[in-house]
Swiss-Prot record:
Pfam families: PapC_C, PapC_N, Usher. It is a multi-pass membrane protein. Its main location: membrane. Keywords: Cell outer membrane, Fimbrium biogenesis, Membrane, Signal, Transmembrane, Transmembrane beta strand, Transport. Belongs to the fimbrial export usher family. GO terms for biological process: pilus assembly. InterPro entries: Fimb_usher, FimD_plug_dom, PapC-like_C, PapC-like_C_sf, PapC_N, PapC_N_sf. It comes from Escherichia coli. This is Outer membrane usher protein CssD. It comes from the Bacteria. The keyword Membrane applies. GO terms for molecular function: fimbrial usher porin activity.
Amino acid sequence: MMLAQKQNFMNQFYKKYHYSIQKYQITDLLFFLFLYPFSTSYGNEQFSFDSRFLPSGYNYSLNSNLPPEGEYLVDIYINKIKKESAIIPFYIKGNKLVPCLSKEKLSSLGININNNDNAECAETSKAGISNISFEFSSLRLFIAVPKNLLSEIDKISSKDIDNGIHALFFNYQVNTRLANNKNRYDYISVSPNINYFSWRLRNRFEFNQNNDKKTWERNYTYLEKSFYDKKLNLIVGESYTSSNVYNNYSFTGISVSTDTDMYTPSEIDYTPEIHGVADSDSQIIVRQGNTIIINESVPAGPFSFPITNLMYTGGQLNVEITDIYGNKKQYTVSNSSLPVMRKAGLMVYNFISGKLTKKNSEDGDFFAQGDINYGTHYNSTLFGGYQFSKNYFNLSTGIGTDLGFSGAWLLNVSRSNFKDKNGYNINLQQNTQLRPFNAGVNFDYIYRKKGYVELSGIGWHGNLYNQLKNSFSLSLSKSLDKYGNFSLDYNKIKYWDNAYDSNSMSIRYFFKFMRAMITTNYSLNKYQSYEKKDKRFSINISLPLTKDYGHISSNYSFSNANTGTATSSVGVNGSFFNDARLNWNIQQNRTTRNNGYTDNTSYIATSYASPYGVFTGSYSGSNKYSSQFYSALGGIVLHSDGVAFTQKAGDTSALVRIDNISDIKIGNTPGVYTGYNGFALIPHLQPFKKNTILINDKGIPDDIALANIKKQVIPSRGAIVKVKFDAKKGNNILFKLTTKDGKTPPLGAIAHEKNGKQINTGIVDDDGMLYMSGLSGAGIINVTWNGKVCSFPFSEKDISSKQLSVVNKQCNRPENSGD
């Protein structure tokens, strides 16, 4: 290759992969050593090695075919499935390099060792681990583990939870709407919040101004704390009830409830159990499609297997029983679920005590509420609850069960007593996923005896006017594969006084034609208060125009009703920048009524997501009116390292810091870049789950080197976790070193340069080439090997080039260093 081509190849290869090397403080030159022989002596057979082969702390020249002991960054595979990359200590045993795996490390990999082996390096062979092999050429560690030693790898312990930083932070939203240049409406929302250890204080205040009328109110104030080991969440103050049995209400008091986010999906989500009878010693194989998720031997008699395998994704299971004579029996297990259903043996509860807010109770009456869900065996969940307040009591009980091919069914019966009124409520639900037909069926039926009063109704003294009698809803969905999707929804509601009875039906068909996405919809609505049925047909067409520069789409919609009103709209919308932080929309609407009146409306809107907030503006107008709207949404975080102006913080978020370096893209949220002081807020994380914080390396300037572009955090609920990425700002340079006697420092010699608190390191290759990154200004680089040392200076002139260039330097030994 030509020299320019070689250097360009090295540059691109280095920029793509050097972050993972720096993560473990292994110099960038290690990476270059693998690449450089190909770029300078292409086609020659010379010694080279993968940069990751060198363990941390390795500081002598290489002169052996046997890999040295030390710590290596390796990819770990459990039963041929990659689990993680980690630094593992290795030592020489016999004539090979073997890993040092502690009991704690094995546990973090999901491997259970049930002995008292607390040594630094556990005796894996005695623990039952069948085979461990290390593939040195690719730095892959393979561990073969019997199934009985495997636990759920995604399970998280309390010591893994990050409660985040102490912080005072504010979320704000400011809206202004101006109609016809005279009528003005202003809205301001401010949420001052405090995080202290695992305690969360949450507040929200709102200000409204409609022309001259002004109101200011507090929405809520509450204190919250999570207890991970107990899997519960505590709230004291003003909040909302949360229940699978009852509707939700606002209250002031105390709530203790199971936090389902603290469980992994396989711990809490319902999955079926496989039951059967083996006539003799038999092999049981359970498949989902072509994937085997259970392969076990059982003795003669009844058997039962809970489906806990992480490979199970729901749907039909095929069970095969093979006895000792080779005879086979096969049957199919279908399953469906409902939100109330839980894993067998798991209990989920919620208990609340306090006062109802006045909008639910005229006098703010005291009330108490509790509900429990318990997953039983035989694919069922039992649930029930109670509510009581002044002159009011409600008791509810129910069951959700999976009946196989006919789907999941729920039956819930509640009875209420309020003063002289009493009644009951019956709810029957069904959900069936007919996966062989790519179809789903759901219905929900409620019957309510007159006299039944919900808790929210006691504020109206149990007024039975306009009380629900029954309701029925049915939903059908069918995938037509390449021909699109079809769905039908039907709803019927009836009241005891017939005042607000209604029927509605909607038929929807979605399909693609070439690049266009087309949705058609027909709806029919009948209301008791209107004699005429409302019939509507609509069609919506969306056509992507480009995806090369931004994302631009055109859209057209048309709607026609039997009332004589027809509406059409045509427009174009899109986004700019790779993360779609700038969005825009232009629409032209036309409405024609049966009296001949026609209204034309124009609409234009744009929004921009910046590191400091999201800003929106829009304008709409016709020949009779105009409207302008402006909005700003953001946050301010005060913490031990200063102040960060950010986008609005979600319930759980991460504050990312890259040492005073701005404009670095973090994650996928539009507009999330590091600000002027190097801070950025990732607004939405999943509590008690593994969240990956990823830096977009495409936008990193050439003069910035990051030790790592990916980190993982497990935040508690409401936490703001701080994630710091170490960065070096400076140029990258390749030195060609010679000593005073014309020789070169040996392969493996260590170079280091100190710039304040930052230490830059590198390793010399077998041609005396030294790659250094993050160099700025002028300084001295020291090179050491086998107790010997030499040094050389560099200047701004040496590192001024933006391209990777080779600079010749003589490395001189101090007089007292010896030979």
